[in-house]
Amino acid sequence: ILGLVAIAALVSCTKEDNGNDTTIQEGTFPKEVTYKNENGKVASKLVSLIEGGKILSSEIEIYNENGTPIRTQKDIITYEGNLIKKRETIGTGDDPNYNSFTETFSYDGTKLVKSVTDYKKIVKTITTTYSYDGDKLTNMVKTEPIQTIENGQRVEGTKYTETNFTYNGDRITVKEKTYTKKPSGLITDENTSFEIYTVVGGNVVKKEVTYSPSLKETIEYTYDTKNNPMVNNLTKIILPDYFIEKSRGRNNLLTTTITQVRNNQTFVTKRYYEYEYNNKDYPTSQKHFIEENGQKKPAGSIEFQ
């Protein structure tokens, strides 16, 4: 979770629709982001160092319910030109083994073609490759070591996650296949899932998932017309599948309606988001609510400074 928050913050808030410029424009990037829980207590705080239009480092601190820091993660960023070449992460807390790693990025022009994550305190490397058809992402393949059993012995195999993207107008079908390859080449633990996204005006407006014949889920989203600090030119490079993430649309999320059909019964959950904005139409705060018994109840907030 820490890594996802850090990389999201790292690539946020540069100016979009400015050619291929990936540098940060003044007034669009929050140097400090504070996350609070439903009771108004600080859950985490992210502070970034910016020089020359680039984030050189960021540090996130996680707090327990009593407001005591329990975990930190610091990122040191290295660039090649205006593209991120390396992210060195040092973590402390309950599991520093998994919070300390180095991630390197390789490009073809400005397209990300490979990322490699090397953990510092455990022997583990995760590699992800990306393929494109023109400007469209078509395939991602992630490989990582995994412990498995072969011939009665515990051995190291490789877990594969293959993600394919098919485009049809506003609809994007995402097929994800996971499996384990043993040292002998035997394939086991195969699983395939499908998700369908509808993207309009740079925002995901619907996500459809069929988990089983008796369980289906449809999620519908609405947005404001302001600038989303989580999407920009650098986002599109470093996170090539950004376009299926609701939090990385062109605008800011206003409502989420989750409709689940389980065994012919329908269940609906609604979430709401409210914002304050600066004079550049970027959010300075977000309040999150969830609807229960027809009433909106606080579910957390974010402050941008």
Q: What are these language model-derived features?
A:
Residues 1-4:
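Sec-dependent signal peptide recognition
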Residues 15-305:
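Buried hydrophobic residues that stabilize the cores of well-folded domains
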Residues 9-12:
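C-terminal motif of bacterial Sec signal peptides marking the signal peptidase cleavage site
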